[in-house]
């Protein structure tokens, strides 16, 4: 359930040329083993980047090899970047996630200390208050590059999106991000239709919301002195922060979807219709609208998530990675995260608008669910999905019974 960027790979060099670093400074990684943190002596760079899909990435790369080893998608209020005052042998900073006990440590490699506080302030500012799309000048707006695709290129893009990429259209960064892009670039493209250009490949680079494992290359000594003492409770009198087993930063989960329809891809007119209303709150037709986030509360979900069968069905949709264990506890952490609750609210609003029918049809959902999505009836949509699930279970039971009968005939 990794978060794949929707558009970067479609315009040559879009991810690097159109997304400048918001802040960058030289810093090395620190390796966490148990409750001990030891410095990785390679020369590195920490930087924050806003990509064309409006997501904020916190990255660390090896300055010698140029390899980006850590690329985390960060949402506002996910984490805090601050100095570890308990460490007196070096300028150590920690990226501390608020959901769980996950911490990533770095040690400053800038030769001068006069800008340390400024770097720390900027990191927190951009992580928790990301700039609006297009606010970074000509280099930061993805809408202009979408316009360069033309109608033919964008149509090709929509037809080749994977399920996870399509799900971003109904996630917090999808609806909000595309709605914002619709202003300067995408709206003009959809309104007038730009000149068709040849489409590029549609394989998009998957960005994990967790740090990737460090490479096994030999560590290179930095010209700046590394902290000589591991950050441990025994090493300092004041004690360093105790680091417990890591948990992932909360991210927007991809909702389980049915098999992709093998018929027609999403049409450009469908996306135009969706974008036209996604930033306008839907007016309830009868009574008050249903907010799934207020219905699927942790108390309601707890007994459901305790079912081992449900857990096994949800585990494949969890993020994967060395520091991201796929367990029942992680299911609970994901579904109770603020990002998931926000995604549920956004999905409810989008579903109530009656504009998600084409997307639901693309996911291969039953006709009852598609009809409910076209009508903006959240309750009917939920019942249709529940009925579809029951039919699937009945079908599986019937198939198993037929198999048993065939075996008895043998």
From Swiss-Prot:
GO CC terms in record: cytoplasm; nucleus; proteasome complex; proteasome regulatory particle, lid subcomplex
Compositional bias (Basic and acidic residues): 381-401
Record's keyword terms, sorted: Cytoplasm, Nucleus, Phosphoprotein, Proteasome
Modified residues (Phosphoserine): 18
Domain Pru residues, every copy: 17-130
Keyword Cytoplasm: yes
BP term (GO), one: proteasome assembly
InterPro entries (UniProt xref): DEUBAD_dom, Rpn13/ADRM1, Rpn13/ADRM1_Pru, Rpn13/ADRM1_Pru_sf, RPN13_DEUBAD, RPN13_DEUBAD_sf
Record field: compositional bias (Low complexity): 191-257
Pfam families, alphabetized: Rpn13_ADRM1_Pru, RPN13_C
MF term (GO), any: endopeptidase activator activity
Annotated region (Disordered), positions in chain: 191-264, 381-410
The keyword Plastid is assigned to this record: no
PROSITE patterns: DEUBAD, PRU
Similarity annotation: Belongs to the ADRM1 family.
Assembly information from the UniProt record: Component of the 19S proteasome regulatory particle complex. The 26S proteasome consists of a 20S core particle (CP) and two 19S regulatory subunits (RP).
Stated role: Component of the 26S proteasome, a multiprotein complex involved in the ATP-dependent degradation of ubiquitinated proteins. This complex plays a key role in the maintenance of protein homeostasis by removing misfolded or damaged proteins, which could impair cellular functions, and by removing proteins whose functions are no longer required. Therefore, the proteasome participates in numerous cellular processes, including cell cycle progression, apoptosis, or DNA damage repair. Within the complex, functions as a proteasomal ubiquitin receptor.
Protein's UniProt name: Proteasomal ubiquitin receptor ADRM1
Organism: Danio rerio
Gene that specifies this protein: adrm1b
